[in-house]
Regions:
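Short, charged, solvent-exposed linker or helix-capping segments at domain edges/interfaces
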Residues: 105-110
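Non-catalytic interaction-recognition regions
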Residues: 2-104, 115, 119-580
Length: 580
């Protein structure tokens, strides 16, 4: 249900019917095919909806636009419509004003839709995957993971609200160079525990965090010096598997605490073990996109990207200046690169599991990888340009009292997701991290815990709790929230009442916009605006002590606002507490 679109459609219908009637009577030239464009004026003094039909049609009619508008108005019937009046404005705009039927139908429609309010079928029948966080399982999750987690999870919810069949996935990088580095780092700490700190040099490019020391200590307590004298591969495998067996469950627990659950944790190692990476590289070779050099197998990345750029209208000279480079798929030692595995993983998403659209949430530092991966999908015939979308998110800066915060007060280490959740409520974390992905965000730790109107999540939750308190108080006096059909909604004529209903009607369009732009922060901004509209209504329109029909109508409106506030908060993964 989208009452704004319904009103716009009715403006078009009324305008078209008036034109047909006037043309049939010979008052306007017949055969003018102009689709009435309908907008919502920025200034409500100009009506609730406006159309530029007369301006567009007047030229073809060879008439003055205001004359066309007056003729249409004279032949327009508003009976049983959502509108009470239509006026001419400016050079020939027709401005329509809503009547009580639209306001009553909006409240009634929200009641009928219930928790499904805001749902639409824009993406119905489409199978989407959202892959997000996918942090290396070699250490604690950081603030970029925290932001990506909220963005991915909330975007998935918004896409579901728009009718898509959505799959949430975490890609576990449990193979390749970073796991070898992980094993060597654990090995060095393991040796140091047994032989002494100075007996073994730590790898310069190793993982230096205290978490590596803690994992090595736990491994030693479990296994003793059992792996001291065995062959290196056996020791590395044992250390890496132990580290992953500790880190991955902890990641799952932290993300669950954060309100994030996945449909699947997909392991990179499974692509290697099944031979799918090798099969994918062979598929690229069979299509003529690889070559051998210096004992390694290379992907013709530069050719793939150049072909795409030519399709976009770039000249060969401009392409040459970009300095495009090819990528190694298989090293001279026979090991596949991370890029080869990533290509195989995305081929699996499309060719094996059949997703229509794949959305990856990445840090902005991966921007150079976007075109290469899309190009690889194109080379495999999987239309990466249109089926693979990458949302790049900017960095996060934590601040407190105007100062940048880098270390946890409790641990003295770099702040991890665990540290953040220990200090800041989950609702605040999810709210603040759900910001526009392309903007660098500043997370104010002090603001996130404030209990006043400056904190947006508190402001919205307070509006919800305020309504819950009102409903309970009136119930104690014998007034229960009526069904829309039983309330006299025609008494809701105050500007603040109408403004609140108009704001409630915006919600379905906001959901669609958030899904279209891959930007769920539209929901946050909407909720703040809705809370503000409710507070204005509540402060201007007394409920207690009014005549019963007015009291019940306003109570119904307040409860409708409560339902939509909860709907939106649930959509972005925040709670709606009944008490504050």
């Amino acid at each position: 249900m989208n009452m704004i679109e319904s009103a716009k459609a009715q403006v078009r219908q009324l305008t078209a019917a008036a034109y047909d009637k006037a043309a049939a009577a010979g008052l306007l030239p017949a055969g003018i095919a102009v689709e009435p464009a309908v907008e919502i004026p920025k200034d409500t003094a100009n009506g609730d909806y406006t159309t530029t039909f007369c301006l567009a049609a007047a030229k073809a009619m060879k008439m003055n636009p205001r004359q066309v508008a007056q003729t249409l108005i004279d032949n327009m019937t508003l009976t049983d419509s959502y509108f009470t009046s239509v006026e001419i404005a400016g050079p020939g705009f027709m401005n329509f004003r809503l009547g009580e039927k639209w306001f009553a139908d909006t409240v009634s429609g929200i009641e009928t839709a219930g928790e499904k309010y805001g749902e639409n079928d824009t993406l119905a029948g489409r199978k989407y995957m959202v892959e997000f966080v996918s942090a290396n399982p070699t250490g604690p999750m950081h603030m970029g993971n925290a932001r990506g987690g909220v963005l991915g999870d909330t975007l998935a919810s918004v896409l579901q609200k728009s009718g898509a069949d959505v799959w949430r996935e975490f890609y576990v990088n449990d193979a390749g160079n970073q796991i070898e580095k992980f094993a060597k780092s654990l090995e060095a700490r393991y040796f140091q525990i047994i032989k002494g700190e100075d007996a073994v040099e730590f790898p310069e490019d190793g993982y230096h965090g205290d978490d590596i020391r803690e994992l090595a200590q736990a491994f030693y307590e479990n296994e003793g010096d059992k792996y001291l004298d065995c062959d290196e591969k056996t020791r590395h495998d044992a250390l890496a598997q132990f580290g992953l067996s500790v880190n991955i469950p902890k990641m799952k627990a932290d993300l669950a605490r954060y309100g994030i659950q996945y449909d699947q944790w997909f392991f990179e190692s499974s692509l290697h073990d099944s031979g799918y990476v090798a099969d994918t590289v062979q598929a690229l070779t069979d299509r003529g996109y690889t070559y051998e050099k210096d004992g390694a197998l290379w992907l013709k990345t530069s050719d793939i990207l150049a072909a795409q750029l030519r399709q976009e209208g770039k000249s060969d000279e401009a392409i040459e200046k970009l300095g495009l480079k090819d990528d190694v798929l298989c090293r001279a030692n026979g090991f596949y690169t991370y890029f080869a595995a990533d290509i195989a993983y995305h081929r699996n998403k499309f060719a094996v599991r059949g997703f229509d659209k794949v959305i990856n949430i990445w840090g902005a530092d991966h921007h150079g990888h976007v075109a290469r991966l899309k190009g690889a999908m194109d080379a495999l015939g999987l239309d990466g340009q249109h089926r693979l979308d990458i949302v790049l998110m900017q960095l996060v800066k934590l601040v407190r009292d105007g100062e940048t915060v880098r270390m946890s007060k409790r641990t003295g280490k770099a702040i991890s997701l665990t540290d953040l959740l220990d200090e800041i409520p989950v609702d605040a974390c999810r709210w603040f991290f759900n910001a526009k992905p392309e903007t660098q965000m500043e997370f104010d730790l002090g603001l996130a815990v404030r209990e006043d109107s400056e904190n947006p999540v508190y402001y919205v939750q307070y509006a919800y709790a305020r309504i819950c308190t009102l409903v309970k108080a009136l119930a104690a006096e014998g007034y229960t929230v009526p069904a829309a059909a039983e309330a006299d909604l025609s008494v809701l004529t105050a500007d603040e009442e109408k403004a609140l209903i108009k704001q409630l009607a915006q919600y379905p369009a906001v959901v669609q916009l958030a899904a279209r732009d891959y930007d769920p922060s539209f929901i946050n901004r909407y909720l703040v605006e809705l809370a503000a509209a409710f507070h204005k209504f509540y402060n201007a329109c007394r409920i207690k002590g009014e005549a019963e029909n007015v009291l019940l109508a306003r109570l119904k409106l307040a409860d409708t606002a409560r339902a939509v506030l909860k709907n939106g908060m649930t959509l972005i993964g925040c709670s709606a507490p009944e008490k504050m």
